[in-house]
Amino acid sequence: MYKAAIFDMDGTILNTLGDLTDAINYAMKETGHKYGYNEKIVAHFFGSGVYVALKRALSVENRFPEDRLDLIGTPDEPDDCFKDDTEIERISKIYRPYYNAHCDVKTGPYPGILELMKKLRDRGIKTAVVSNKPDAAVQTLVSDKFPGAFNFSLGEKTGIKRKPAPDMVNECLRVLEIPRGECVYIGDSEVDFATGRNSGMHVISVDWGFRSHEYLASIPVEKIVSNADELYQEITR
């Protein structure tokens, strides 16, 4: 049994797609860009933070192939994606305050997640959230949706490298005071799998989030679960 479980947020414990989609469309519209994206495509924008999400949205606007979006924001980033950092930052200044003010409108926990957190606490397992979502939104959502459920939560902030770099997880482990070999990282994307591996931890991938079971299996990831009960069994076995 693991002594600590570290969770991603978007697509793992919370279905945030509705609010993320609204915020992307608002920011793009306000800055004169293409908007009206649906949740299916927005799911592929996110996973590596706001900057990469906006870069992917702008690349789609410029007819970048949707099936190559996951390469943007990685070391294998294509040369033909959107590259104007000044424009990305301009849109980000609209997106961030709007999302922080509207991050809890449509968002809610996935089935069984609240019960899972209680069962883990009852077993004495420490829990934490490490997300590339802006830290202000992470703290708001943890407080509103999971009061008292987590021992630690951390989102994207200045001065610490975002996932898949291990820095955020390392900070979490420092606070939890649990050896990394006794912790597991849980997420729904290729970024989460890389984060866990880069942090020297086992990884459990969930298939109810922003990436499909088939996509996760193609990486291939270490272990895939399809519901909260399966996840509990993997954490406590």
Give the label of every model feature segment.
Residues C103-T107, N132, H202:
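Short, flexible loop segments at the rims of nucleotide/cofactor-binding pockets, characterized by
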Residues M1-K3, K29, F64, R121, ...:
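Asp-based, Mg2+/Mn2+-dependent phosphohydrolase catalytic module
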Residues E87-I91, K133, A149:
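Extended, well-ordered alpha-helical scaffold segments
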Residues P109, V130, K161:
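Residue-level marker of regulatory loop/turn positions in helix-turn-helix DNA-binding domains and
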Residues I6-D8, V130, I186:
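Generic enzyme active-site microenvironment
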Residues Y2-E115, R123, Q139:
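N-terminal helical cap/lid subdomain that shapes the substrate entry/recognition surface
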Residues T12, S131-K133:
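Conserved phosphate-coupling serine/threonine residues in phosphotransfer and NTP-handling enzymes
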